[in-house]
UniProtKB/Swiss-Prot annotation:
Keyword Glycosyltransferase tagged: no
A biological process term (GO) from this entry: regulation of gene expression
Keywords of this entry: Cell inner membrane, Cell membrane, Membrane, Transmembrane, Transmembrane helix
One Pfam family of this chain: AbrB
Membrane-crossing residue ranges in chain numbering: 20-40, 59-79, 83-103, 138-158, 173-193, 196-216, 221-241, 259-279, 288-308, 315-335
Protein name: Putative regulator AbrB
Membrane topology, from the record: Multi-pass membrane protein
Main localization of the protein described in the UniProt heading: membrane
Single GO cellular component term: plasma membrane
Family, similarity comment: Belongs to the AbrB family.
UniProt cross-references to InterPro entries, sorted A to Z: AbrB_dup, AbrB_fam
Gene label: abrB
Subcellular location: Cell inner membrane
């Protein structure tokens, strides 16, 4: 029964999250549900998170990001615009080269390999890939596999950088603060702005519109965004389930042949982004944790959750991640067409 299966998923997610919190792992409330979802998927238990729940979680995350966006971040980006532009261009070029090599040296069709290797929002890439005739199940597998490895790598980097401070971050959590009018206004903001983002059909619009609207309203002192930990935990759980349940045993079997090349492409992209993060620490004089999360190849919501569980500069991270997302969305179709047309196929 679906109700029983959802109950079992909730229990397993809770147990894993508590375990991760006990060892002071960043983004424990994301990793627990994500791993639980993967376990269920690999055992052939088919559960699908309602789309409304995922969109609501994205809207809540958008409000969380808005809490940390200030006018100073625009100044930082403007002062360092050559570096920011270089990071975006290298990301686009790297994804194009990795996608080209993946199609060239694997059995993946051109469209599928191109869209699957694009470091944009996973959900957005899957939706756009469908419009361009790619195998969306393979694209989804590749995208969520990338998100899984990106999340794991980001959590490890964050944990290593925090060191003994990881325990202090977790100890400051207040799960059930008193309910105030600010919470009600924040939920209203999430509902209204999230609905607008959904109606506009923007990729990740249910996160981006609340993020922008919340930042404007809070900077104008019209609202004070308040998000208790219990509400954020629910949003993290929905995001984790979306990733974990996105894996499919049948599609995994189908992807076994090109899996080594897929993994190699993911690791190559991670290595390139880590190199860019090191460059950011040298030229922008920021800590490596902030630089790594800012250049990490998505997804936007996953990086936001991990950044929230650390002492990183959330505003800079989200500004860089949003710019990367839009640049990929704008150039993705052209890059995919180029790879599909010109990447030579290996003879069978």
């Amino acid at each position: 029964m679906p109700v029983l299966q959802w109950g079992m998923l909730c229990v397993l997610s809770l147990l894993l999250s508590i375990g991760f919190l006990a060892v002071h792992l960043p983004a424990a409330l994301l990793l627990g549900p994500m791993i639980a979802g993967i376990i269920f998927s690999m055992r052939g238990i088919t559960l699908q998170l309602p789309r409304s729940a995922f969109l609501a979680a994205q809207a809540i995350l958008g409000c969380m990001i808005a809490q940390n966006l200030t006018g100073s971040i625009l100044t930082t980006l403007a002062v360092n615009w050559p570096i920011v532009l270089a990071i975006l261009l290298v990301t686009l070029l790297s994804s194009a080269i990795v996608g080209w090599l993946l199609v060239r040296y694997s059995s993946l069709p051109g469209n599928t390999g191109a869209w699957g290797s694009s470091p944009g929002g996973a959900a957005a890439m899957v939706a756009m890939a469908q419009d361009y005739g790619a195998d969306i199940r393979l694209v989804a597998f590749m995208q969520y596999l990338r998100v899984l490895f990106v999340a794991g790598a980001a959590v490890l980097v964050t944990r290593m950088m925090l060191g003994d401070n990881a325990e202090a971050v977790n100890q400051h959590i207040v799960w059930f603060p008193p309910v105030s009018i600010n919470l009600l206004l924040t939920i209203l903001l999430a509902v209204v702005a999230g609905t607008v983002g959904c109606l506009l059909r923007l990729p990740s619009g249910t996160m981006l519109i609340p993020m922008l609207a919340g930042a404007v309203l809070q900077s104008g002192q019209l609202i004070t965004i308040e998000l208790p930990e219990w509400l954020l935990a629910m949003a993290y759980m929905a995001i984790g389930w979306r990733i974990g349940l996105g894996f499919d045993k049948q599609i995994l079997l189908r992807a076994l042949r090109p899996l080594p090349q897929i993994l190699l492409s993911i690791f190559a992209l991670l290595a390139i982004c880590a190199g860019m993060a090191w460059g950011l620490t040298r030229f922008m004089h920021i800590d490596f944790m902030t630089a790594y999360l800012a250049t990490s190849p998505g997804g936007l919501d996953t990086v936001a959750v991990i950044a929230a569980g650390s002492n990183a500069d959330m505003a800079l991270i989200m500004a860089m991640q949003t710019l990367r997302l839009f640049s990929i969305l704008l150039t993705g179709p052209a890059i995919a067409r180029f790879i599909s047309t010109y990447a030579p196929k290996r003879s069978a």
